[in-house]
């Protein structure tokens, strides 16, 4: 099954920031986004289902400082990426 990956405005800004200021994070984020197309619950970046106030969201590690936060909508076969910088502060 192939998912549509939708980036929030914040996630788009984060990706542009990585492209300008952190090329390694940019490359890793692109690899993670490519994986989300086919298997959003498994793969690299240690996918983790979040709990408590972020229940329903998933996280993947870009590096020690940054996490990709996303929500999977299986009914519409979509993955909504909420943010990519820092640890869960913009969700």
Please provide the spans of the model-predicted regions:
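Enriched for short, Lys/Arg-rich terminal
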Residues: 2-4, 12-27, 60-67, 71-91
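Short alpha-helical linear motifs
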Residues: 31, 52-55, 70-74
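A short, surface-exposed loop/turn module that caps and links secondary-structure elements
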Residues: 34-60
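PIN-domain endoribonuclease scaffold, especially VapC-family toxins
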Residues: 27-34
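Low-complexity, intrinsically disordered regions enriched in charged/polar residues
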Residues: 9-12, 44
